């Protein structure tokens, strides 16, 4: 029978059953991130460097190869917001309009001495009825205005010839007859006076009768019948503008000739009645003007 072993104490058993615990780990020592300056002197230079970089960026933003001078921007500026007592009442006839309200009403050039848009539409429809293709009607109107520049825009003229387009033609009498019936030849020619003016200068083609009308070579284009409407803003404007502008000498020459012609045509206006008892069957006396003292100098 084997010998009995003495029982171990409870403390020894418990010490054998429990595992050995490792010693506590030493906490890691934090290391500074790379590039971090630990010196006090280096940390003091950071604000100065930032200011230097900010100044550099500011100077770069201010430099430019473009510099706007004499700036004045009225169009597109922010609209003012008047106070309630200054907004006015637009329903009151005595309301005082502001500058912005006047600016909102755009001007529309208009002249009662030239053909209106409605007149031109009626002329277009009438010429279509005579057989002129729609796409060539504007060209026919141009031809009529160029024709009248050398003849006359008077309704009493006896026109000759035809106006042509590719594949067709129409008698000048028919075109001018319809234009006179609807709007008047002179009123239509005035509407296209700037276009005719540019056309004559592009082709170096002044009115044919300029010499017989008494115009000097330097003002020969003033013999144009509708010269006084070349700079009218209500007329049809060339795409490139009116070139060249009429000169002062041309205005003087045109108005002088216009006065002479009107006096010659209006000699019967001296009569208050055209009955034979008044006129005696004769034309009125010639209206004369003394131009010698026009410049306030006796000659």
From Swiss-Prot:
Give an example GO molecular function: structural molecule activity
| Keywords of this entry | Capsid protein, Helical capsid protein, Ribonucleoprotein, Virion
Q: Which residues form the signal peptide?
A: none
Q: Name the residue ranges with Basic and acidic residues bias.
A: 35-46
Map out region (Disordered) in residue numbers.
1-46
**Coiled-coil intervals:** none
> What does the UniProt entry say about where the protein is found?
Virion
The answer on whether this UniProt entry bears the keyword Ribonucleoprotein reads yes
- Residue ranges annotated as compositionally biased, kind Pro residues, are 20-34
Look up keyword Ribonucleoprotein and say if it applies.
yes
What GO terms fall under cellular component here?
Answer: helical viral capsid; ribonucleoprotein complex
Cite the InterPro entries for this sequence: Carlavirus_coat_N, Pltvir_coat
**One Pfam match, by short name?**
Flexi_CP_N
Q: What does this protein do?
A: Required for genome encapsidation. Forms ribonucleoprotein complexes along with TGB1 helicase and viral RNA.
Family label? Belongs to the potexviruses coat protein family.
Q: What is this protein called?
A: Capsid protein
Organism field: Helenium virus S (HelVS)
Query: What phylogenetic lineage does the species belong to?
Result: Viruses, Riboviria, Orthornavirae, Kitrinoviricota, Alsuviricetes
């Amino acid at each position: 029978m084997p010998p009995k072993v003495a029982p171990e104490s409870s403390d020894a058993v418990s010490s054998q059953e429990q595992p050995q615990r490792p010693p506590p780990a030493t906490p890691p020592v934090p290391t500074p991130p790379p590039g971090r300056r630990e010196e006090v002197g280096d940390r003091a230079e950071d604000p100065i460097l930032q200011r230097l970089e900010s100044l550099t960026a500011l100077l770069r933003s201010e430099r430019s190869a473009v510099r706007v001078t004499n700036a004045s921007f009225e169009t597109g500026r922010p609209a003012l917001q008047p106070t309630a007592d200054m907004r006015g009442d637009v329903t009151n006839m005595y309301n005082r309009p502001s500058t912005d309200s006047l600016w909102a009403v755009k001007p529309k050039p208009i002249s009662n001495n030239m053909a209106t848009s409605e007149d031109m539409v009626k002329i277009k429809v009438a010429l279509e009825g005579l057989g002129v293709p729609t796409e060539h009607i504007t060209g026919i109107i141009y031809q009529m205005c160029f024709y009248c520049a050398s003849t006359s825009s008077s309704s009493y003229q006896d026109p000759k010839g035809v106006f042509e387009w590719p594949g067709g033609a129409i008698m000048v009498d028919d075109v001018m007859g319809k234009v006179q019936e609807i709007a008047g030849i002179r009123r239509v020619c005035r509407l296209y006076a700037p276009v005719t003016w540019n056309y004559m200068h592009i082709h170096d083609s002044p009115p044919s009768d300029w010499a017989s009308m008494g115009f000097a070579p330097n003002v020969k284009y003033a013999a144009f019948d509708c010269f006084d409407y070349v700079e009218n803003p209500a007329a049809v404007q060339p795409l490139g503008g009116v070139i060249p502008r009429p000169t002062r000498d041309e205005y003087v020459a045109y108005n002088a000739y216009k006065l002479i012609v009107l006096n010659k045509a209006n000699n019967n206006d001296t009569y208050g009645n055209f009955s034979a008892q008044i006129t005696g069957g004769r034309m009125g006396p010639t209206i004369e003007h003394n131009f010698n003292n026009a410049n306030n100098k006796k000659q």
